[in-house]
């Protein structure tokens, strides 16, 4: 096993964690909270009136850093003035290294210093999002753009339209990103409607991602089957807290998202949980040695129909 270590920060809250032996450890000043400037919130220039308006953006940052083995992981949540919520993982620390003879093949790694081979590897995060958008009765909708064939309705060949598909049950809810179609997922409350007719909602906008490089019969894939899909949706269950099941490092596979969705519970107008998988393939480079600059991955939650207009218009 590998124990998880956290280190104090300023302006922070305490946290209890379970170590590799199952004991509760109390850490002081672990979860950091601060506000920071974030450039431009919105801007427009009215050319005819020769007038510009601009507002500064600020965000509340809730963060913590953890050390697991040779890696250091920062988990950052950003809360923006317009209702946007962003998650960002910061990956740093040191590479997993092995000694290498001069001229030896580096097939499974990369030469990062004389006699030092940095091993190729992957990282996976699964973020459990217990959504309650204006209440617990939520529905997940997959949205992507569809191109319209050139013809009478599209004479210039530049038209496209959104296509929405309700995710009705758990087996249908193992989904993957499709950046070529701008795919995202809305979580809406169909009993809450604004004056424009929009259901109150938030949309999950994925960032860059990868598919697992492991073979399907590998021990890793048996234990971590959740990496097979970028998004899973399940009905809320208080006992389902971790995507690979309760004891990922001590089992030979089985419990976890691939098994849970076989219940095929309905997902429309109910309490839903989204599980977003994020993967990073790390091909080491000399610049990663001896300590790695931060690599960033994450996703964004944006309000869609939750407000009736830009909620930051009253900022001075």
Where are the language model's segments positioned?
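Extended effector regions of multi-domain proteins
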Residues: 2, 6, 10-84, 90, ...
